[in-house]
Design a protein with these regions (language model features):
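Structural scaffold elements adjacent to functional motifs in cytosolic proteins
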Residues: 48-50
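Rhodanese-like catalytic fold shared by cysteine-dependent sulfurtransferases
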Residues: 2-10, 19-46, 55-87, 93-131
Length: 131
């Protein structure tokens, strides 16, 4: 009985690690660089959704980006409905909140969602235009 219990515990740990690695790989596949985001955006092939707070947005933002703070994203999804089948790039300060936004949008049925690596900080460091 003890051997079976140990086997079950070990199996559970291996399974949990497998899902964790798979999730990390999925998020990596959904990430794009600021340069890639800029190119998609400039060619009107994508919309950028900035999920930072109002104070962060007012300080600096990407021209033409849609501003919806992460805490309001679920209730404001109807504002993004027209982009459901278009590429949507989520962006925040460093990439953490935008990764959460990516999950929200995918769960809501958005099919082409990307998280911009490094957020507005990486965009600015790349010398790309901000307001």
């Amino acid at each position: 009985m003890r051997v079976f219990s140990k086997y079950c515990q070990l199996s559970f740990i291996v399974l949990l690690m497998t899902f964790t690695v798979a999730k990390a790989e999925m998020n990596e596949a959904d990430s794009i660089s600021p340069k890639q985001a800029s190119e998609m955006y400039a060619e009107h092939k994508a919309v950028i959704v900035d999920v930072r707070e109002d104070s962060e947005w007012n300080e600096q933002h990407i021209p033409g980006a849609i501003h919806i703070p992460l805490a309001q994203l679920n209730e404001r999804l109807p504002e993004l409905k027209q982009y459901k089948d278009s590429p949507v790039i989520t962006q925040c300060r460093t990439g953490r909140r935008s990764a959460q936004a990516l999950d929200v949008l995918k769960s809501a049925g958005f099919s082409k969602v990307y998280n911009m690596d490094g957020g507005i900080k990486a965009w600015d460091d790349a010398g790309l235009k901000t307001e």
